[in-house]
Curated annotation (Swiss-Prot):
Xref: Gene3D superfamilies: Aspartate Aminotransferase, domain 1, Type I PLP-dependent aspartate aminotransferase-like (Major domain)
Tagged with keyword Amino-acid biosynthesis: yes
Organism of origin: Pectobacterium carotovorum subsp. carotovorum (strain PC1)
Pathway stated in the Swiss-Prot or TrEMBL entry: Amino-acid biosynthesis; L-histidine biosynthesis; L-histidine from 5-phospho-alpha-D-ribose 1-diphosphate: step 7/9
Family: Belongs to the class-II pyridoxal-phosphate-dependent aminotransferase family. Histidinol-phosphate aminotransferase subfamily.
InterPro entries referenced in this protein's UniProt entry, alphabetically: Aminotrans_II_pyridoxalP_BS, Aminotransferase_I/II_large, HisP_aminotrans, PyrdxlP-dep_Trfase, PyrdxlP-dep_Trfase_major, PyrdxlP-dep_Trfase_small
Obligatory cofactor(s): pyridoxal 5'-phosphate
Descriptive protein name: Histidinol-phosphate aminotransferase
Amino acid sequence: MSNIEQLARANVRALTPYQSARRLGGNGDVWLNANEYPEAPAFQLTLQTLNRYPECQPVQVINRYAEYAGVQPEQVLVSRGADEGIELLIRAFCEPGKDAILFCPPTYGMYAVSAETFGVERRTAASKADWQLDLESIEAQLDGTKVIYVCSPNNPTGNLIAREDLRQLLTMAQGNALVVIDEAYIEFCPQATTAVWLDEFPHLVILRTLSKAFSLAGLRCGFTLANPEVIQLLLKVIAPYPLSTPVADIAAQALSREGIAKMKANVEEITSARRWLSDALKDIPCIEEVFPSESNYLLVRFTASPSVFKTLWDQGIILRDQNKQPSLAGCLRITIGNRYECERVVAALQSLPGINA
């Protein structure tokens, strides 16, 4: 061990970093592994004040997002992607070495990585066979749990968590823990948002992003919706200038009437492509099951997923391997691309009839 490594915190030395799509790499021309929108938006920078520091919480961005989400501006915090929101909640509410977070695998990996980075215990309540919450398991672990993360629609399974279960969880956790509902993909099923419950449940927190339906993954702009008291606590630990001036500029444009209309058109396009791809995949011999989805990706179980993954990788089609997630043996996640990209996937898979493990 080098002297530098010895200086590092023990938990950081032992940390396995989150394996993002870009970290995993690849040399493809069909990128269907990061749940990105397939086309770049046509925004142009309009602000020319790069010599000045930006606002900590850009007023125009906050106001426009509040109007879009149907909440009050004091219930909104903007950050460097929803990932920063995940981290801020742990920093503000969890004592390292004492408190815990809880999440429900299979799910998004950054909840665990963020907690481990700050020396906070990670607890899990594995989802049931239908990928719904195991409320009994969660309730049994509430003592010492400060933050509960639930992803709905869930990444990578694509399903919504039952609303009655979310309400039961909120009632169960009241006075004990924050319940954080990650709505990164909510634009694909807006009727399922829990933002309408914010005034009813002061411990409810909602995470949002411009990375998915708004087609701005490269912008790194996310939002936390919560009770004003929670927002004020998060403002104590957020960096003084979380959003650069160009990011705030583009985010405000994306949240204009025209920007929101374009986002809704994106959603219609992706939803249509998802239906087409789901139907096309069901008759392919190497596929065991195509799971229903309320998002911009499909989870698919293959007869021999490692072979499928490598074969498509070699053809420049990059998917996301989910085999290491609990209960997802044999599964790959396919982002919904444009029609050409979806057709490439189908053609590549049709060339693999009868593939076996």
